[in-house]
Amino acid sequence: MIIKKAELETVCGITSTFPDNTDPEIVFAGKSNVGKSSLMNRKSLARTSSQPGKTQTINYYKVNDDLYFVDLPGYGYANANLATKEKWGKMIEKYLHTSKQIRCIFLLIDIRHEPGKNDKQMYDWIVYNGYQPVIIATKLDKLKRSQVAKCVKIVREGLGLPKNGVLIPFSSQTKQGREEVYEFIENLLAEEESV
């Protein structure tokens, strides 16, 4: 998949009505500062920030005029108050229940650490809502090559990822894993078109 064109089309806050899109939606979820925006920014899709909790809305990016990348607010941001976190949670839940165009949910997890409580809750929540998330294990460049297999195993086991569950190690610095992510999306949409 080659991204030729991408632009921010819709921004939805807590009280917003979600757009009634007809094109497929590819969703990106993850803890604050895990690298969601960095992954999407491979083609200038989203602004990046070193400040966690920056994405506080659901952002729809129109890609190649035929699909959307949907960026969900980062969860687990320590400086957000409880009321704000609850509002974000309700907004995400409303989106998952409302959208009829979700084709895939990518859940980004920091490969350097065992999945935390919020990661596990988000994974279970996505599964409960009828989706099997694809795990993108970010910050790959922070590991030595000899550590990767062990860390991948820890992430898989920490989430309870099934044997056939997809996990893609990714680095925004070296671009490793980027093509696998885009190829996964391309194959998914191609399978859908052939049905």
At which residue positions do the language-model features occur?
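Canonical P-loop GTPase G-domain recognition
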Residues: I3-S16, K142-V195
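Hydrophobic/anchoring residues in structured secondary elements
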Residues: S50, L107, P169-S172
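Switch II of P-loop NTPase G domains
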Residues: F18-N21, S50-N59, P73-R103, I111-W125
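Charged, alpha-helix-enriched surfaces in structured cytosolic catalytic cores
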Residues: V34, A83-K87, K117, K150, ...
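Conserved C-terminal guanine-recognition region of P-loop GTPase G domains, centered on the G4
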Residues: K90-G165
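Conserved G1/Walker A P-loop phosphate-binding module
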Residues: M1-N79, A190-E191, V195
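Conserved nucleotide-binding/hydrolysis micro-motifs of P-loop NTPases
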Residues: K54, L67, G74-Y77, R112-E114, ...
